[in-house]
Amino acid sequence: MRAPSPLLQRLAAMPGMAPGRRRLVVLLSQLGDFDSLEYAQALVQSLPRLEAAGIGLLAIGIGDATGADRFCAYTGFPRELLQVDAEPVLHRQLGLYSGLQAPGGPWSGLLLMCAGIGSPGTLAEVFRGYSGDRRAPARLESPLFAVLGRGYQRPFELATVRLRNMVEVLGRWRTYVPSDAYITQRGGTFLLDADDTLLYSYRDRGILGFSETMERPLAFLDPYLVV
């Protein structure tokens, strides 16, 4: 299956994202969204392996240049690999989930989604952040968590990461989210082969659902990365 035309049109103007190599394109939600921060943090850890495998990377988020600068400074994501759109035009062209559209506006929709309404899997993922997950790698180097063991994601570990992200965003809300109009918009992931064939795609279904395998968000890349 060929990658969607709107996506190919966007990539055509991007240096290093032309056909002839594999490319990973991540459409983030708002830059201040939990999912965007967590996804970027996961990608940063895999940058050397992506480069070794010759896979080009581009992330496209909702926001502005000031927010993108702060987002990259906080997450460590390379600024040159992040584009921002003021409105989710490409998201819509690709048919990505716009989120729950509630009568009270975007904030009402967001709060309902946080409660799991119109956002499947959100509550289970929140719970996983507190309960720990032996299938997931550790996220924090801390004596406090080391008491609970090593080599896996300990109870409250992921919840602590998310709390830190929340504190960062809430302290700079208008930097990360210049407009509240699109706070429910979800993202998606597209992995293209050298000939523009779509190797993998995933469309987010809800909050804290940016991957099919949240315990290892980039597991879909395993067949394509250099060991």
Where are these regions (language model features)?
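Cofactor-binding loop segments of dinucleotide-utilizing enzymes, especially the Rossmann-like FAD-
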Residues: S29, I62, A194
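Short acidic-hydrophobic, aromatic-tinged amphipathic segments that line or gate anion-handling sites
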Residues: P6-Q9, R79-D85
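Structural microenvironment flanking redox-active thiols in thiol-disulfide oxidoreductases
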Residues: Y39-Y74, L90
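A short, polar/charged loop-to-alpha-helix boundary motif
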Residues: I207-V226
